[in-house]
Amino acid sequence: MKTQVEHAVDGIITEQMATVAHDEDLSPEYIRTMVAEGKIVIPNNSNSTPKPVGIGKGLRTKVNASIGTSSDIVNYQAEVRKARIAEQAGADTLMELSVGGNLDRVRREVLAAVNLPVGNVPLYQAFCDATRKYGSADKLDPEELFDLIEQQCEDGLAFMAIHCGINRYTIERLRKQHYRYGGLVSKGGTSMVSWMEHNNRENPLYEQFDRVVAILKKYDVCLSLGNGLRAGAIHDSHDRAQMQELIINCELAQLGREMGCQMLVEGPGHMPLDEVEANILIQKRMSNEAPYYMLGPISTDVVPGFDHISSAIGAAQSARYGADLICYITPAEHLALPNEDDVRSGVEAARVATYIGDMNKYPDKGRQRDKAMSKARRDLQWDKQFELALMPEQARQVRDSRLPEEEHSCTMCGNFCAANGSKTLFDGDLQGDKC
């Protein structure tokens, strides 16, 4: 069976491409061309029917939500509820990142619960299984890792974050720079580095990259090149280890595309705002515009409990400069496993961020909704305001909880409503458009 990339190269517009074109108000031929060039991906699986979601050049910036058990908290029903909440709140994709309990069970229950494209990190289960079976993650048998990747593809996952870019050379760059304020912050990345050091061997996901691609290509699953050496502190942003891994991932993205597999490149998690534009420019240049999946980024390290806000600020910048998929951050980041309220808050914050970013990335079409909202506010058209709101239910709920005496106003200003005063003063003189 051919992949989306192979169909696109052959000039065929698939059902998935046509759906994305309709949803994005773009031509099917544009989507086909970008998929063929590796600049748009549509996470998919030949064993399942996830909702077609386009990620990449010229498209709305998408939001990913991550859920999953931990070794301390295992509640399968709660993770299914979180997955459904993420979908209801407007997430475009979902990652199931469990490391506690029966990992096959939670993955399959989440896949059955939502219509979104679902991804994961195969290394999590591989190292968990090795620990249970052999007493140490460092005793992982690479053959069991490849078997697991295939099993998870068979279950219906649409994309996988796989840490192929960590190799002996990148680890040496980290060691020789003699600092890392935030240390290593990727669970999969840290475990793979430990395995490599303990066994004095190369990363099998890098060494046998063609084998990884062959498995995912068999199911038309999108390969997201994970960043196990990403910066976990803003003072580590763009250090040599992170950049070396990015270089390798961009090289692998090109190789994977040439083999007929859909490829994403993952970006960093902590980054000061003044470095965001440069980071995206570097990734786009080195990867020939492969879709970029940014993990936030968190733009300051000192607001635990409010990292969803810090991340939203960074995500707006990322979307504006060309990031294609943003992984949400919740208020629980750095503190605890997110609960259901945290998941909703994280999705909402990321949606606001990507909307703001897209307003500036696509100014011609991205600001028309805001113009319509401004007119509705000026004219005190409340139903129209709710219709245009990004999250209308929340807006309506707030207003209904504090209704004013006069229907046209709100309880913020009451009888001193500036919009109503403006309407009275100018009586239609402000109804025109800019020249």
Curated annotation (Swiss-Prot):
It comes from the Bacteria. Zn(2+) binds at residues 270, 334. GO terms for cellular component: cytosol. Its EC number is 4.1.99.23. It is an enzyme of class 4 (lyase). [4Fe-4S] cluster binds at residues 410, 413, 417. One of its GO terms (molecular function) is 4 iron, 4 sulfur cluster binding. Binds 1 [4Fe-4S] cluster per subunit. The cluster is coordinated with 3 cysteines and an exchangeable S-adenosyl-L-methionine. GO terms for biological process: cobalamin biosynthetic process; thiamine biosynthetic process. Keywords: 4Fe-4S, Cobalamin biosynthesis, Iron, Iron-sulfur, Lyase, Metal-binding, S-adenosyl-L-methionine, Zinc. InterPro entries: ThiC/Bza_core_dom, ThiC/BzaA/B. Substrate binds at residues 95, 124, 163, 186-188, 227-230, 266, 293. Its cofactor is [4Fe-4S] cluster. Pathway: Cofactor biosynthesis; adenosylcobalamin biosynthesis. It catalyses: 5-amino-1-(5-phospho-beta-D-ribosyl)imidazole + AH2 + S-adenosyl-L-methionine = 5-hydroxybenzimidazole + 5'-deoxyadenosine + formate + L-methionine + A + NH4(+) + phosphate + 2 H(+). Pfam families: ThiC_Rad_SAM (PF01964). Homodimer. Catalyzes the complex conversion of aminoimidazole ribotide (AIR) to 5-hydroxybenzimidazole (5-HBI) in a radical S-adenosyl-L-methionine (SAM)-dependent reaction. Is thus involved in the anaerobic biosynthesis of dimethylbenzimidazole (DMB), the lower axial ligand of vitamin B12 (cobalamin). Belongs to the ThiC family. 5-hydroxybenzimidazole synthase subfamily. This is 5-hydroxybenzimidazole synthase. It comes from Desulfuromonas acetoxidans (strain DSM 684 / 11070). The gene is bzaF.
